[in-house]
Amino acid sequence: SVVLLICLLLLGQVDGSPVPEKSSVKKRLRRMTPFWRGVSLRPIGASCRDDSECITRLCKKRRCSLSVAQE
């Protein structure tokens, strides 16, 4: 009977423990080192988000471009 009482108390503690909110937990993005940034540069025609991702350093219309005037 004492064991049952202890188990019930422990279950009550687990059930009542606070759960961290997902909105307060932010996932930190890892930054690439200069070595990996250079190794992972994208070729002409590959999709991109900004100039730093392309081997030519030109991202136009979400594609790695060869020149600024290229459409």
From Swiss-Prot:
Question: Localized where?
Answer: Secreted
Q: What is its main location?
A: secreted
Q: Which cysteines are joined by disulfide bonds?
A: C48-C59, C54-C64
Prodomain residues:
17-31
Keyword field? Antibiotic, Antimicrobial, Cleavage on pair of basic residues, Disulfide bond, Secreted, Signal
The entry's cellular-component GO terms read: extracellular region
Alphabetical list of InterPro entries matching this protein: LEAP-2
Could you confirm whether the keyword Manganese appears in this record?
no
Family, similarity comment: Belongs to the LEAP2 family.
Tell me a GO biological process for this protein.
defense response to bacterium
* Protein name from the UniProt record: Liver-expressed antimicrobial peptide 2
Q: Which domain of life is it from?
A: Eukaryota
Coiled-coil parts of chain: none
Function (record text): Has an antimicrobial activity.
Task: Give the signal peptide as a residue range, or say none if absent.
Answer: 1-16
Q: Does the keyword Signal apply?
A: yes
Q: Which organism is it from?
A: Cavia porcellus
